[in-house]
């Protein structure tokens, strides 16, 4: 479906600086060993050993796999993406709450606040007490609009928080979009 390279806008000394995101239409495609980077010379004319050379310069974290549950596809290119991680007691209740309250509210109001896309995904791997089980993302056109979201302003106003499943955010990094492809609809 597409990919994006994101840069953390405020990393700590031991945090990651960049995040590479691959989006696939389904689990089978994500688990396919014949992905383009294994056949990069045929697909883009660059040998795989060039793509993977000099990895000693980089510190890699692990791979995290999520499955999209709800989405408002981007209506314009995103400049910034806010990643919101949480581990609710009841993932299904959180998804139902987001579908009932957040999705229609954002669809109706996002254009007035620079929000260009939104989604909710559940963690496939890794799982456990040290890993968030749910991730929401909010895509914005500008840094200022993303920061208004973090401040509880803009599109966040008017959400019925008293009716929604409570989210305790474990981490909310704000990422700058360095490069991205457009998802095919």
Protein language model regions, located:
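Short S/T/G/P-rich N-terminal loop/turn motif that feeds into the first structured element of a domain
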Residues: 1-45, 50-185
